[in-house]
């Protein structure tokens, strides 16, 4: 299985690529959960398609225990997800205007943290 930093490094190369609602293409456009699903798939992980399901099937963690490579989830009904890259930052497919970008992990109050990594 992949090292946490490998997944982050892989995901970071797509910064600046487009946000496409319902998309799963790392180069032609993805939404938040499609971006996570496709990035993790590169390393043999099968994540569910939508953010809420990704949260449900992840191993839950306390925000104080967050590590590089963990997923940060947002919204009371979990509608958004980003990949924690360290230094209190995430990379995520944000909006159609900004695409895949780096943001502070607390740009919005996180609802939870989950991981698929050891």
List where the protein language model places each region:
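Aromatic- and glycine-rich peptidoglycan recognition patches
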Residues: 2-10, 45-63, 85-118
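Catalytic nucleophile-His microenvironment captured as a short glycine-rich beta-strand/loop
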Residues: 71, 79-89
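Catalytic cysteine-centered active-site loop
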Residues: 13-68, 115
């Amino acid at each position: 299985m992949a090292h946490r930093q490998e997944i982050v490094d892989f995901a970071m190369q797509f910064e600046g690529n487009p946000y496409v609602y319902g998309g799963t293409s790392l180069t032609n456009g993805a939404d938040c959960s499609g971006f996570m699903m496709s990035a993790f798939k590169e390393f043999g992980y099968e994540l569910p398609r939508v953010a809420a399901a990704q949260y449900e099937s992840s191993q839950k963690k306390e925000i104080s225990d967050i590590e590089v490579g963990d997923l940060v989830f947002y919204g009371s009904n979990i509608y958004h997800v980003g990949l924690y890259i360290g230094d209190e930052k995430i990379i995520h497919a944000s909006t159609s205007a900004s695409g895949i970008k780096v943001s502070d992990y607390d740009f919005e109050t996180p609802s939870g943290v989950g991981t698929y990594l050891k």
